[in-house]
Amino acid sequence: LFFVLLTMPLAFFNWEENVVSEIDNRQLTNNPFGPNAEPGADLTASLESYVQDRIGFRDEMILGYTLLNDQLFHKMIHPLYEYGKDGYVFFKQKQNVQFGDYHIAFAEMLAEIQDYCQARDVPFLFVLNPEKAAVYPDKLRDGIHYDRSWVQQFEQKLDELGVNDIDNTQLLQDRRAGGEQVFNKVYNAGHWNDLGAFYGVNNILESLSGFFPSIQPNELGDFAVTETLQETLLSSQFPIHEYEPTFGRLCELEVKTEEYDAEVARNSQHRGFGYFVNPENVAAGAPKTLVFQGS
């Protein structure tokens, strides 16, 4: 029996290539001898990572270990998340980001994109949206020295290059100070909820209205606002019980995603794409908008 238990993880080894783990929302290491192996990677390290990622019952073992620590010690031992104060959950905190060459190169790329757009009479706007820790830094666990000074340095570089940009951080901090929950305490630990998105997107629309007066901010009455019960953390099987605000548009949208899906070249790991038409806004003369977004 012991031998059977010992060999079962090997018997259920995960051989599938290019698979994303549901427990920690990342792509598992591919076979270092296969066609999808990372070029130039250290073979020993790749083999070790491959076995650790693909061993049978990996997700179940991680979940069991996480739940045991939560119930016994109220500690979240999880690849993605950690507890803060007062019941808050955050993405696992890493070392503070240091402003460097990458950010300078990224700012210069944005300036080039803006120049490309403006040469074709197309307005350009870069939007920076804050992570949860930037709006609720006081809810991080003790011992965390949260420093996002790189953001100010990055925005200073954007100003030097003349990039048209807005930052929604202060807006959401002000909304929080006014008593509104613009990020959930637990669910979706890094991203704003629909209420936060409502305010952030309106700030974007107000900025764009300077180019196109026909663009108007949304109103709460434009949406059916309900609550959705979330029973696990996002991209995880960790159990929770939290309601989040859900905004559904009352105006029916035309969805053309499938019609154009094959025409849009995308990275294999980032396949997100959507094409939506709001007939009411089209009738009001609103322009088409192309949005590139990160997390």
Explain the meaning of each model-derived region:
Residues 1-295:
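Extracellular glycan-modifying ectodomains
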